[in-house]
């Protein structure tokens, strides 16, 4: 069973994504901000982190940097899922090492397809 860590501070998005990925037989972990995400990631070693950018405490960019600097997480894929949809935001996310950058609002079907493609 693949492990996914959903990192977002919007409860409705978290609930929707959690439901979707559990239905698709993922083991799902939830974090509300970057610092909580890093704690969970180091403990659970997820196959993929679905990461928002604009969050309290530690933002998505900083969280991604920390994930990329952690040897135990070197095989973990990271997908940004953000409302920040300017070309400069997307470029920054990919330059920092995100495997994909998807924007909100999003199609659940497309999101699941993108994640399955990354993990298979």
Regions found by a protein language model. Name each.
Residues 55:
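Receiver (REC) domain active-site loop signature in two-component systems and cognate sites
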Residues 30-48:
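Acidic, metal-coordinating helix/loop segments flanking the phosphotransfer/catalytic sites
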Residues 11-29:
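Two-component/phosphorelay signaling modules centered on CheY-like receiver
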Residues 106-116:
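C-terminal output helix
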